[in-house]
Amino acid sequence: MTVEMELVGVRVQMPTSTPILLLREVTGRRRVVPIYIGGPEAHAIDLALSGTPTARPMTHDLMREVIEGLGAALERVVITELREGTFYAELFLRDGAGGVQTLSARPSDAVALAARTGSPIFAEEALIDEAGIEESESAEDEGDEEEMVEELRKFLDEVNPEDFLP
């Protein structure tokens, strides 16, 4: 079963300056899934979130234009699994004839493309069970984003990529 996620943003883990993509469940337990990504991908996602125009199309802008130019649309993105410390994702493209094509993608590329097309992001529930982090009760009850961010920062300061290995 898949669960709809919202793109919280990209944060930087200190002291390594490693970018981390943060996705949160839209409903339910509102767990957060942190995904380590590369610097260029983090920049691409930040540009999409901020709506910052660029002089020339970025790679994910080009991907969007190619998809639309072929008469297709990005229906949704699904973060599918975590295997040996690596996250996997799939793009679901609806073609002009109404068929759906599924393409394997890195989560960072899938999310960057979804951010540019306004397409929904989902994650497999088993993946959220495995890699998700619970929000604190008080942050959820009070709607205190700052408390949630601080809790997440503490987690990110202590976590290592190896923690996600089986």
Please give the residue ranges for each predicted region.
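Divalent-cation
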Residues: 1-166
